[in-house]
Amino acid sequence: MRFKGLDLNLLVALDALMTKRSVTAAARSINLSQPAMSAAIARLRTYFGDDLFTMRGRELIPTPRAIALAPAVRDALLHIQFSIISWDMFNPVQSQRRFRIRLSDVIMLVFFERVVKRLAREAPGIGFELLPLTEDPDELLRYGDVDFVILPELFASSDHPKAKLLDDTLVCVGCPTNKQLKRQLSFENYGSMGHIAAKFGRTLKPSIENWLLLEHGLKRRIEVVVPGFSLIPPLLSGTDRIATMPLRLVEHFAKTTPLRVAELPLALPPFAQAVQWPSLHNRDQASIWMRQVLLQEALHMTTPPDSVEYRP
């Protein structure tokens, strides 16, 4: 099919090349042979009057022209895809749909286990690809690279729909042998003690607790940085270090790991975890169904207490 002299199939090839940055991988992703993909590149170059890609080792490096074209091409293809899919009837019992979801280790442990267990009973053909939050959520949603992103609402993209899932709050935790946690922490003690902190992604972006602490003037002396909250409890054992963690995750680990829990020197407001999806998925029947499942399971979650009960 052609539009103003352009074979629209070439846009599919261009999108695959921008995504995979490899001729072989791009060809495989859209079921083309490598020679056919090479021919598509030649035709794209002729039509746009630009090289579009150069080789650096085995990687394709897009030119500024290709980078400028990529968002419009992806948006056009997604509009076509979801305009067609949205009209298909979705039967979760028979579906083999695989949902691609970006989420934190906190949500994985305290919430998503419920979802997986429920669907194993009600929709056993449904699968998941659960991936860490490592990239900019706005970019992930814009390019339709995920079905859902679950993240603190403070970090949610303003360009895509969202729904609140659950509330959480931050507490201070340490080893049961940490004597400084036997009393209410002062600002001075909290700031002077060694901390373990979580940061995320390739660039180690600050997590929700770092944002809230700085927003309210609480500073820490960070001695250890880990790529997720779930790695913190084992590293507290046998040390005088402390950490600031979401209470729901602390409650999860407290079942198996000895922890001393204390209130922060300043009560911080609760924060919400939200689910987002690409705006183009709004009418996709499978996406609508999964949103309902997520929201239903979130309603069954208990509300975290307003204050922390001291644990010796």
UniProtKB/Swiss-Prot annotation:
Domain HTH lysR-type: 6-63
Keyword presence, Glycoprotein: no
Annotated keywords: Activator, DNA-binding, Nodulation, Plasmid, Repressor, Transcription, Transcription regulation
MF (Gene Ontology): DNA binding; DNA-binding transcription factor activity
Gene3D superfamilies xref list: Periplasmic binding protein-like II, Winged helix-like DNA-binding domain superfamily/Winged helix DNA-binding domain
SUPFAM superfamilies, A to Z: Periplasmic binding protein-like II, Winged helix' DNA-binding domain
InterPro entries the record matches: LysR-type_TF (IPR050389), LysR_subst-bd (IPR005119), NodD_PBP2 (IPR037416), Tscrpt_reg_HTH_LysR (IPR000847), WH-like_DNA-bd_sf (IPR036388), WH_DNA-bd_sf (IPR036390)
Highest rank taxon of the organism: Bacteria
DNA-binding region positions on the chain: 23-42
Keyword Transcription regulation among record annotations: yes
Protein's job: NodD regulates the expression of the nodABCFE genes which encode other nodulation proteins. NodD is also a negative regulator of its own expression. Binds flavonoids as inducers.
PANTHER family listed in its UniProt record: HTH-TYPE TRANSCRIPTIONAL REGULATOR LEUO, HTH-TYPE TRANSCRIPTIONAL REGULATOR LEUO-RELATED
Family: Belongs to the LysR transcriptional regulatory family.
The name this protein goes by in its record: Nodulation protein D 2
Species, as recorded: Bradyrhizobium japonicum
